[in-house]
Curated annotation (Swiss-Prot):
<dbReference type="InterPro" id="IPR003697">
    <property type="entry name" value="Maf-like"/>
</dbReference>
<feature type="active site" description="Proton acceptor">
    <location>
        <position position="69"/>
    </location>
</feature>
<keyword id="KW-0963">Cytoplasm</keyword>
<comment type="function">
    <text>Nucleoside triphosphate pyrophosphatase that hydrolyzes dTTP and UTP. May have a dual role in cell division arrest and in preventing the incorporation of modified nucleotides into cellular nucleic acids.</text>
</comment>
<dbReference type="GO" id="GO:0036218">
    <property type="term" value="F:dTTP diphosphatase activity"/>
</dbReference>
<dbReference type="Pfam" id="PF02545">
    <property type="entry name" value="Maf"/>
</dbReference>
<comment type="similarity">
    <text>Belongs to the Maf family. YhdE subfamily.</text>
</comment>
<dbReference type="GO" id="GO:0036221">
    <property type="term" value="F:UTP diphosphatase activity"/>
</dbReference>
<keyword id="KW-0546">Nucleotide metabolism</keyword>
<dbReference type="GO" id="GO:0005737">
    <property type="term" value="C:cytoplasm"/>
</dbReference>
<keyword id="KW-0378">Hydrolase</keyword>
<dbReference type="GO" id="GO:0009117">
    <property type="term" value="P:nucleotide metabolic process"/>
</dbReference>
<dbReference type="InterPro" id="IPR029001">
    <property type="entry name" value="ITPase-like_fam"/>
</dbReference>
<feature type="site" description="Important for substrate specificity">
    <location>
        <position position="152"/>
    </location>
</feature>
<protein>
    <recommendedName>
        <fullName>dTTP/UTP pyrophosphatase</fullName>
        <ecNumber>3.6.1.9</ecNumber>
    </recommendedName>
</protein>
<feature type="site" description="Important for substrate specificity">
    <location>
        <position position="70"/>
    </location>
</feature>
<feature type="site" description="Important for substrate specificity">
    <location>
        <position position="12"/>
    </location>
</feature>
Length: 194
């Protein structure tokens, strides 16, 4: 079977691939995410995912490299990972009682072959009190996540609704990723369920 390399240090992306039984090796890309610019959030996540996959692909010729990048967008403003607790509180205040978009870019690279797409999910937070925001920030959970929350963790108690791919919000849209891997000739649905 062809080797799949995950160009990400995200434990959530690793867990999602394990969940569906896709074997992979992790290789952390060295990419300056702040140096990437785009005209739209969708274009931004696709460019970032592709840049990550390309950065790792040069070290693994012949392998399929999977890169991904997730952002949160509210009122057209991109919210990345908070720099500190104050910024996490500010971000959660922005999301309180409102809908926002979560976009994940997914890129596959094998040599000169490239495939890029993105997924968008709409998430609505319940109205949050200052105490709820402080409680959540004090857990430490928001600090390494785009938009300062992890839907798969304690923030689940703060979410009013979701429209779209739940796994996209976690960090990797599994259905789209599997479709892309299949399109790339990676055999996912063959053999036994061993």
């Amino acid at each position: 079977m062809q080797q799949l390399i995950l160009a990400s240090s995200s434990p959530r992306r690793q867990e999602l691939l394990r969940q569906v039984g896709i074997p992979f090796v992790v290789a952390v890309p060295e990419v300056d995410e702040h140096a990437v610019h785009a005209d739209s959030p969708a274009e931004l996540v696709e460019r970032l995912a592709l840049r990550k996959a390309r950065a790792v692909s040069v070290r693994y010729p012949g392998a399929i490299v999977l890169g991904a990048d997730t952002i949160v967008v509210v009122d057209g403003e991109v919210l990345g990972k908070p720099a500190d607790r104050a910024e996490a509180e500010w971000m959660l205040g922005r999301l309180s009682g409102r809908s926002h978009q979560v976009l994940t870019g997914v890129a596959l690279v094998r040599g000169d072959e490239e495939l890029v797409a993105h997924e968008e999910t709409v998430v609505r937070f319940a109205p949050l009190s200052r105490e709820q925001i402080q409680w959540y920030v004090e857990t430490g959970e928001p600090m390494d996540k785009a938009g300062a929350y992890g839907i798969q963790g304690r923030a689940a108690a703060l979410i009013a609704s979701i429209s779209g791919d739940y796994y996209n919000v976690v960090g990797l849209p599994l259905h789209r990723t599997v479709q892309m891997l299949t399109q790339f000739g990676y055999p996912i649905f063959t053999g036994g369920a061993g």
